[in-house]
């Protein structure tokens, strides 16, 4: 990451992190074609995340005095999940995501974590490729669901084949 730092989250970062969370939600809305994802104020989900897991293992990427990235680590024994991870769209492809990932991996190793997971949404192909290139190449669990709306939503696209089964995403 050029001319920036990764540092611990501090309460004055709240608004910038809400904005990053909102930007990620807007990306999800775009790739799924569903404007209701995240509700009316998706930034509030960052507040809920903080209330649920705390800020002890939350870091921001800062450049020129501005928060441009965010990453968190949720530890459960020898397993941990990276949540959230987001880089401002204007700052992508500049090494910020790599720097955030390296910070989380370093922390996880220091804590004795054996397995680190990340759960990008299925249609975020750029994120999936990014994580794959970083080394996330093992599937630990797969989340499957049924659309119970009547009729089922038409937002689902034909998706990948996995273990001989075709999925939508």
Residue spans for each PLM region:
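Conserved GNAT-fold acetyl-CoA-binding loop/helix
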Residues: 4, 11, 22-48
């Amino acid at each position: 990451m050029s001319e920036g730092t990764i540092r611990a989250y501090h309460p004055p970062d709240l608004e910038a992190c809400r904005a990053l969370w909102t930007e990620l939600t807007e990306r999800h809305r775009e790739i799924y074609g569903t404007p209701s994802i995240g509700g009316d104020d998706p930034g509030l989900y960052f507040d809920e995340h903080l209330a649920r897991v705390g800020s002890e293992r939350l870091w921001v990427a800062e450049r020129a005095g501005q928060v441009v990235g965010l990453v968190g680590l949720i530890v459960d024994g020898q397993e941990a999940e990276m949540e959230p991870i987001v880089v401002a769209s204007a700052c992508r492809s500049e090494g910020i995501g790599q720097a955030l990932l390296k910070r989380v991996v370093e922390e996880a190793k220091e804590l004795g974590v054996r397995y680190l997971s990340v759960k990008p949404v299925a249609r975020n192909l750029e994120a999936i490729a990014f994580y794959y290139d970083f080394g996330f190449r093992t599937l630990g669990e797969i989340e499957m669901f049924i659309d119970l709306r009547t009729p089922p939503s038409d937002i689902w696209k034909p998706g990948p084949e996995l273990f001989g089964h075709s999925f939508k995403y």
